[in-house]
Design a protein with these regions (language model features):
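Short, solvent-exposed loop/beta-turn-alpha elements that line the ligand-binding surface or hinge
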Residues: 55-57, 138-161, 235-236, 253-276, ...
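C-terminal lobe and pocket-closing loops
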Residues: 75, 142-146, 151, 155, ...
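Glycine-centered hinge/linker elements that transmit conformational signals in sensory
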Residues: 216-222, 260-295
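Hinge/lid segment of periplasmic solute-binding proteins
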Residues: 51-54, 125-189, 334-336
């Protein structure tokens, strides 16, 4: 590497020039893609190592437990960079999601030392953390001797930092006093509306402005467009049916899952606000949803949007992102920061967060922390967002990155605007408590019964609240 080449890449690593200018100047120097990538990694390693000893755990080997996911793919693709920068070897096991969480629970509950770092959803930490299975990452984040000065914890979106931290006391606010940082945010999903621009335009329709408008348009499409229906949402007997579009709308209409008045949890999903919203939700499904809604998971919702079978979905925005390329409807997908309640001022999307957590049983915690810093750091997440599919990025600096904006505007028009409109109100709206999966699965089952007409909305939500109160009491969570 010549001095001119080294200076060029060091200037980029110091953020004195942008990626586009770097690539243009590298090309003028006659550097190919492989050489450019190698020199860029070397420059970034030099910049990161300037004020922090990344080689302190040289010679150690880490083992990761990963879900099969684009976030994991982005890290694996660039893993050689981490190994060269730290001298730490990394091995990993990857499992599909239908068995992944069973693998995590088995490893942690047995206090296995097999894995040092693993992927986790934020909701799962409500079980893993209080059980003593996770490291509270505050001990690393708040210790300048353990954390690189360039890491910039504050750059991670504040709602994500708080949504992955909790005191462990049922009902206490996420990110509140005494909260432990159980995971590092790694990527997330905003539950919003994605829509088929071509299908709506053919009916002379604009994207829906609120839930009543969505219901009307979904009903019209289900009636007028052969082989298509209006709105796709999840409906299987699973916690995931509640956490996506349903809870986002439920919150926007003023609903809450629990009250914490008096320091005790009380189920209140059967409030007037909760009942009124749920009636609208079921009206939407009956008039404009899929005929076999009770079988719908992430996959059916996603596939129908990409196949042109559904006109709209109210689910993770990254579904719309992934369906925009390589599908029948590629190029036809639009995105909207959706405010369901006509009287609400802004969206309140519930979110799913994939994070990285450290096993409390790892004997290589300092090395594990170096990996977690690298994997959730600005450079790697920018790589994931611009060169792979690590969206939605958890760092504001990545959303501000010129190359990422160019990528979005070129192939995913409207996605950046959807994020900017929804992100301020995007967070986890569930009340943290250890029976989360029991509660939400029972809630989904109750929705199915209401949908089928086996019970009214009023009675169904009242029965659900009574049942959950009993479960909390039996578990010793309430008196």
């Amino acid at each position: 590497m010549s001095n001119k080449e080294k200076s060029l890449f060091d200037a980029f690593a110091a953020r004195h020039l942008g990626r586009r200018e770097l690539l243009d100047r590298a090309a003028k120097l006659g550097l190919g893609a492989a050489a450019t990538s190698a020199m860029l990694n070397a420059a970034q390693s030099r910049a990161m190592a300037a004020d922090y000893d990344w080689m302190a755990n040289k010679g150690q080997t880490l083992r990761l437990l990963l879900n099969k996911h684009p976030y994991a793919d982005a890290a694996i693709t660039n893993l050689k960079h981490f190994e060269e920068m730290t001298g730490i070897k990394v091995s990993y096991d990857v499992f599909p999601e239908d068995v992944y969480f069973d693998k995590v629970t088995a490893a942690l509950s047995s206090k296995s030392t097999q894995y040092d770092v693993f992927m986790t959803g934020a909701y799962q930490t409500w079980q893993y953390g209080p059980a003593g299975w996770l490291v509270d990452l505050n001990q690393f984040i708040k210790d300048p001797s353990k954390t690189a000065p360039t890491y910039d914890w504050e750059d991670i979106l504040p709602n994500l930092r708080s949504s992955t931290s909790w005191s462990g006391k049922p009902g206490e606010a996420l990110g509140g006093p005494g909260a432990k940082q159980w995971a590092m945010p790694w990527g997330f999903e905003i539950n919003d509306v994605s829509f088929n621009k071509k299908m709506l335009a053919a009916q002379g329709m604009e994207p829906p402005k609120n839930l009543p408008d969505l219901i009307d348009k979904a009903a019209q499409i289900s009636t007028k467009v052969p082989g298509a229906y209006g709105i796709g949402v999840r409906g299987s007997r699973s916690w995931a049916t509640i956490h996506a579009g349903y809870l986002s709308g439920f919150t926007n209409y003023g609903g809450k899952d629990f009250s914490t008045e008096g320091g005790s949890l009380k189920p209140i999903m059967n409030s007037k606000e909760g009942k009124d919203f749920t009636k609208l939700w079921l009206d939407m499904l009956h008039k404009g949803g899929p005929k076999n809604w009770t079988q719908y998971t992430w996959y059916e919702v996603a596939n129908d949007l990409g196949a042109g079978t559904s006109a709209m979905i109210y689910d993770a925005d990254i579904i719309g992102f992934f369906q925009q390329t390589g599908t029948k409807e590629a190029g036809n997908i639009g995105y909207e920061a959706f405010t369901p309640n006509p009287d609400a001022k802004a969206p309140t999307p519930n979110i799913w967060i994939w994070g990285l957590a450290m096993s409390a049983f790892s004997g290589k915690q300092d090395a594990a922390w170096r990996f977690m810093q690298w994997a959730s750091g600005t450079e790697q997440l920018t790589f994931g967002a611009t060169k792979a599919n690590q969206v939605d990025p958890v760092r504001q600096s990545v959303w501000n990155d010129g190359d990422f904006k160019t990528r979005l505007n070129a192939t995913y028009p409207g996605f950046l605007e959807e994020f900017n409109g929804a992100a301020p109100g995007a967070k986890i709206y569930f009340t943290p408590q250890p029976l989360f999966f029991n509660v939400t699965t029972d809630w989904a089952a109750a929705l199915q019964k209401m949908y089928a007409g086996q019970v009214s909305v009023d009675d169904g939500l009242d029965q659900l609240a009574t049942n959950i109160a009993s479960q909390l009491s039996d578990a010793g969570i309430t008196n």
